[in-house]
Amino acid sequence: MAQWDDFPDQQEDTDSCTESVKFDARSVTALLPPHPKNGPTLQERMKSYKTALITLYLIVFVVLVPIIGIVAAQLLKWETKNCTVGSVNADISPSPEGKGNGSEDEMRFREAVMERMSNMESRIQYLSDNEANLLDAKNFQNFSITTDQRFNDVLFQLNSLLSSIQEHENIIGDISKSLVGLNTTVLDLQFSIETLNGRVQENAFKQQEEMRKLEERIYNASAEIKSLDEKQVYLEQEIKGEMKLLNNITNDLRLKDWEHSQTLKNITLLQGPPGPPGEKGDRGPPGQNGIPGFPGLIGTPGLKGDRGISGLPGVRGFPGPMGKTGKPGLNGQKGQKGEKGSGSMQRQSNTVRLVGGSGPHEGRVEIFHEGQWGTVCDDRWELRGGLVVCRSLGYKGVQSVHKRAYFGKGTGPIWLNEVFCFGKESSIEECRIRQWGVRACSHDEDAGVTCTT
């Protein structure tokens, strides 16, 4: 009977074993490593923890489903056995009652048989329960071992997953730091580029202003040189006229001298006898001045005199001739790509025309302004202005420019005077113009041009 009494203790041991297997989320989370110091934000940590907990709950569910199935099968088997034993007792118990009142021996025999039967049933029940418990214990032991192995594998995978997550967090932190540094470097570089761009634009603007001033100075110098050349030509012409006049006078004097010498050669004088002395005559008139003698030697230089009063400024001279074309400058930066054209050829200008020439490529320059055609005065009229006019009319370039109404005098108003062009303008209206409508110029100074065909 001691063996039968040990059955509840074994059942308690199995219950303790089952209780030892039970675990919850807190025990599992306690096994997890502490939070990394240099990790991502709180939301990312919560997401990773939620994922780990969901995985753990799924594993626990997978482990508990077979256990519940085995326990349910054992309970069903035990109930089936109880039902069979109860049916046997029900079949045996009515037999002594059906025979009525028998002898006492039969009653004792029946009681002994019933007692033995009950003992046998209890032993059979205990053996069946013990056998079932042994089978359950073996199955549970095997299952617990498998569960422990799986749980250890899950913990190992979780630890490796957390370590990899921590490594990724460290890598992400390093990448974020490097990105912050790179962003700072890019901002500094952008600021330096903007500063350099501003300086370059400022220097370019200053250089453009200096180039304009230099071109104006060159233009003024060319005008002064042209005026000096015209003065030189005028003085040379005057000197040539004076020399021609002096040569004529010299030739006349030589001719007179030759005639006088011939006359003196033909005169002969005969000396007669001396006459009586006459009375003293009156004093005659003074004779003519003699021929000036040769200049004497140069004397020693005298002392330097005091500085005299500065004279009045002279009259502005005539504009000088046009200077030679300068060397081409450096190539500028490449401009932006222009918009797509319509495909049609460039039309000739409708505001400029050439009149009075031998063909359409030359003539007097006339401009249409305020509904009327007018001419251009030839003051400061040079090749760059003629180049702009020829290009606006569709020609390749300029051959020469003309002044002083070379193609005849025009009629109507004189619109422009002292036109200054750089040679890159598309029309003469884009050149530097002081004013429209000139009164200090006449049609004797109308400008003309000959374009290259």
Swiss-Prot record:
Residues 194-255 form a coiled coil. InterPro entries: Collagen (IPR008160), SR-AI/II (IPR003543), SRCR (IPR001190), SRCR-like_dom_sf (IPR036772). The modification Phosphoserine is found at residue 27. SUPFAM superfamilies: SRCR-like. Residues 267-295, 313-349 are annotated as: Disordered. Glycans are attached at residues 82, 101, 142, 183, 220, 248, 266. Residues 272-343 form the Collagen-like domain. The keyword Glycoprotein applies. One of its GO terms (cellular component) is low-density lipoprotein particle. Homotrimer. Interacts with MYO18A. Membrane glycoproteins implicated in the pathologic deposition of cholesterol in arterial walls during atherogenesis. Two types of receptor subunits exist. These receptors mediate the endocytosis of a diverse group of macromolecules, including modified low density lipoproteins (LDL). This is Macrophage scavenger receptor types I and II. It comes from Bos taurus (Bovine).
